[in-house]
Amino acid sequence: MSKTTTALYELIWWSFTLVLASLLLLPIFTKLPDFPFYLDNFAFVVVAITLTRYLFFLDISWLRDHLIIQASASILLIILIFWMIQSFNGFITFFDEEGPDILVKHLDKDTAGIMNTYMKTQYRFFGIWAIMAALLTPPRFLYNVWVRYRAGVRQI
């Protein structure tokens, strides 16, 4: 695969990821401006999609032959996993301490129920997906490093 094709492929995926993350957060942003977990939620969506992409499409990505970067990313993902678990726990603890409807009490009853369900479901779905993808990616990277090194790839 040529470098131009690889760069275009990467650009398209990043564009898709950022647009999807923005669209998923748009209902929360418009109805709940005081939502304290925007950054965490955005990071969960981006991490989930990006790491899942690398899990399944590593063989056709720019990262395939960059063994040192994969090994470094595997180590850095451990730190990211701890941060994501802490953020996820903070989200659950926030609603345990403040009450289940603290952020939607200013909305009418029907809209509040819908937004409360959407907000919690979306955050939990992408949070768990991101954590699982981050747990599976280091072994995938290390396996790829081993296979590519045995194939004679010695790039940084």
Give the ranges of each region predicted by the language model:
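Canonical alpha-helical transmembrane segments
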Residues: 43-69
